[in-house]
Amino acid sequence: MKNKTEYYDQFISKIPNFPKKGVLFYDITSVLLKPEVYSSLINEVYSFYNFKKIDCIAVVESRGYLIGAPLSLKMQLPLVLIRKEGKLPREVFSEEYELEYGFGRIEVHKDDVRMYSNILLIDDILATGGTLKSSAILLERAGGKVKDIFCFIELCAINGRQSLESYEVNSLVRYN
């Protein structure tokens, strides 16, 4: 996927010391304030994945939803939600993950993933790779196969891609 850092960088807010001291937070919600930029992002992801064999899109709470939901509509594919612990009402698979700034647990409904389905996994940012790695494990435990992973932003210096080396990983914006 072509690197679009220069273009999208002007629309991404950077907030120092959030959510804790020493962390630089990349806020993609500012992209939503520019419909033409948001539309461009969705169209670029669509043009890259439209011809790949994908059966469903799985999204990581919550900013992954901002990319995955409009993309699933455009591609006419089911949308599988990966949520934080305790947010899903039916029986779930659960997995612990490590963040850039702590630990957490994510879940997916056991019956939302079809056996052997090819899944495009989406999140807004790739930092340590902990959330995405746990999400991929979760989806595979549910019977799916993670075919591709897409992140709008990749923090290359943290090297999260290394923890995802068994997956195809793509990003539009890369910060060093």
From Swiss-Prot:
An annotated GO BP: purine ribonucleoside salvage
Enzyme category, top tier: transferase
Gene Ontology MF terms: adenine binding; adenine phosphoribosyltransferase activity; AMP binding
Keywords of this entry: Cytoplasm, Glycosyltransferase, Purine salvage, Transferase
Catalytic activity reported: AMP + diphosphate = 5-phospho-alpha-D-ribose 1-diphosphate + adenine
Localization terms from the record: Cytoplasm
EC number annotated for this UniProt entry: 2.4.2.7
Domain of life: Bacteria
Subunit structure: Homodimer.
Family statement: Belongs to the purine/pyrimidine phosphoribosyltransferase family.
Name of the featured protein: Adenine phosphoribosyltransferase
Organism: Borreliella burgdorferi (strain ZS7)
